[in-house]
Amino acid sequence: MSEIVDIYAREILDSRGNPTLECEVFLESGAFGRAAVPSGASTGEREALELRDGDKGRYLGKGVLQAVDNVNNRIADELIGMEASDQVGIDQRMLEMDGTEFKSNLGANAILGVSLAVAKAAAEEAGLPLYKYIGGANARELPLPMMNIINGGAHADNNVDIQEFMIMPAGACCFAEALRMGAEIFHALKGVLKAKGYNTAVGDEGGFAPNLKSNEEALEVIMEAIVKAGYKPGDDVLLALDVASSELFDKEKGIYTLENEAQKEKTPAQMVDFYENLVNKYPIISIEDGMAENDWDGWKLMTDRLGKKIQIVGDDLFVTNPKILKEGIQKGIANSILIKLNQIGTLTETLEAIEMAKRAGYTTVISHRSGETEDTTLADLAVAVNAGQIKTGSLCRTDRVAKYNQLLRIEDELDTTAEFKGHNVFYNIKK
């Protein structure tokens, strides 16, 4: 009864007002799954290709009608009649149809929309919530959230170089408590920024996006907000950064440029010095993309210097790609991977990357993109694989809060079997 009888895609809008693809899959039993595909602003060079129409007279060239057509007139014909429960077989069939390394034929947005909608339809057919369908009986760990409360870089129109300044309420006893702590700190931060005369407009991911005197001032105002909300930095709340340093790197010169620092140009070694100083001064537990995706020597230097003290997360570096992750593991680069479904383009390959990371002792962080929708798949995925951490933006904007609300529902449903590990999610770091 899980046979696919129809697949339909349409063009919808994401949280930035850009088109994206939504897909629906219908089964013989009447079960149904719907999924919408996110889109990134700072993207890795080796990400799977997001197919855009390029017609400047329509949505400024960002339409996805070709990807929609690929679903409705190519993928649908191939998959109708297959069993939705055969996730690996379905994903493999689409990869064979595409036939390219980066999914540039059908488009990763077309393939991912179908892949996720199939999983949702199969879960409904099985009478299971998505997290249990994907993860089985052991899917019960609620993730520690990385909450992006100050936005900079490519996510905001301000002078802050570092793309994301995040809080992690690791001292909470459960996910609901962590969410409450994050929301209270977010509101306290608004008051701190207002008192200093700073703008409290928000960026793509719902964090504040003020012009600040330096990147370090962002950490100072967050520390002040944590205390103002009644919490203790380092015990109750940890800090995390996403530098998105590929955006700051001159490949030819081998130099990073941080416009908001006194010493603007930095070598990879000086960048590590910069991070080490911040880690020694503030309760920073995690730095994502501290080096550019092509600066593997810089990554090795950073991992050797800081990899025992903090979580070093590869995003643009690994692009959720098992082949690239394998190379990084072999070379001892980073100790954590950021997981973004649309970087690789199928649920099967995403699960493969997560499994590979865990076997190597790397932590995993399930992540949204800056262009999001109301789709909450990644919340279910975080619990399904017991990832331990999730990164899905700030404490405002429905496209971000939708994921947090889904995690509240899951925690409620799991009841006494739910786990929340707090500080203990960083199992590969010496305390």
Curated annotation (Swiss-Prot):
Chief location bin: cytoplasm
Cofactor stoichiometry and binding remark: Binds a second Mg(2+) ion via substrate during catalysis.
Pathway participation: Carbohydrate degradation; glycolysis; pyruvate from D-glyceraldehyde 3-phosphate: step 4/5
Catalytic activity: (2R)-2-phosphoglycerate = phosphoenolpyruvate + H2O
The EC number(s) this enzyme carries: 4.2.1.11
One annotated Gene Ontology cellular component of this protein: phosphopyruvate hydratase complex
Keywords associated with the record: Cytoplasm, Glycolysis, Lyase, Magnesium, Metal-binding, Secreted
Active site per database record: E205, K340
Binding site for Mg(2+): D242, E288, D315
Subcellular location: Cytoplasm; Secreted; Cell surface
Record carries keyword Nucleotide-binding: no
Binding site for (2R)-2-phosphoglycerate: Q163, K340, R369, S370, K391
GO biological process: glycolytic process
Top-level taxon of the source organism: Bacteria
Top EC class for this record: lyase
CDD domains cross-referenced by the UniProt entry: enolase
Family: Belongs to the enolase family.
Protein's name according to its UniProt entry: Enolase
Organism: Trichlorobacter lovleyi (strain ATCC BAA-1151 / DSM 17278 / SZ) (Geobacter lovleyi)
Name of the gene encoding the protein in the UniProt record: eno
